[in-house]
């Protein structure tokens, strides 16, 4: 078993646009990138493990020797989105928890939406189970196509955390979370932080 702290997978066009750390080679054309944050004991095992899956190590460095440049973690989660949109302002993004197994959902979305979707995956755990979250980059073609895309994701069993709405409730579970409201009351009783962001606070 490999002890991994985090896993990020970037589709080739996304990987090609990222500002890789000093010493890390740029991806070859068409090369996807898998970013792994591994325990020190796993570093010797990784090359053989990846080779068995048809991959190879492009760059490997211990955290203590990474230097003061851009950290690899800067290419994960929403950092990836920000780097892409700095170069491609005509794009936006979504946040999804994919159904398990994921391949059928991704294939169906790719077939319908083509290169209007570029894929970025993050490994997560939900109730102890390994899952894939996705932060796909989306070519902006207007509000109606975006709504149609989100509806298609939901039809395929993906959970959409909509980043294009104001309140936390509308972007997530769709209902007021009493624990969130209680936490805001405890830590921000005057409601100064992120005003209007928590619908449950406004409706209390």
Regions found by a protein language model. Give the residues of each.
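C-terminal substrate-binding/cap subdomain adjacent to the FAD-binding core in PCMH-type
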Residues: 1-74
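Conserved glycine-rich FAD pyrophosphate-binding loop
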Residues: 25-27, 52-204
């Amino acid at each position: 078993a490999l002890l991994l702290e985090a896993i990020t997978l970037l589709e080739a066009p996304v990987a090609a646009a990222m500002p890789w750390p000093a010493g890390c080679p740029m991806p070859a054309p068409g090369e996807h990138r898998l970013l792994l944050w591994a325990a020190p004991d796993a570093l010797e095992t990784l090359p053989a493990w990846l080779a068995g899956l048809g991959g190879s190590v492009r760059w490997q460095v211990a955290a203590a020797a990474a230097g003061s440049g851009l950290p690899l973690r800067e290419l994960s989660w929403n950092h990836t989105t920000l780097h892409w949109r700095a170069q491609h302002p005509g794009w936006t993004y979504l946040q999804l928890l994919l159904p398990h197994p994921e391949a059928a959902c991704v294939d169906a979305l790719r077939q319908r939406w083509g290169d209007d979707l570029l894929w970025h995956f993050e490994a997560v755990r939900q109730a102890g189970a390994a899952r894939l979250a996705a932060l796909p980059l989306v070519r902006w073609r207007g509000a109606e196509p975006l709504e149609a895309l989100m509806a298609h994701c939901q039809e395929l069993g993906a959970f959409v955390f909509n980043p294009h709405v104001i309140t936390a409730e509308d972007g997530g579970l769709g209902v007021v979370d009493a624990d969130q409201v209680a936490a805001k009351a405890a830590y921000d009783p005057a409601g100064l932080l992120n005003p209007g962001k928590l619908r449950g606070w406004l409706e209390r």
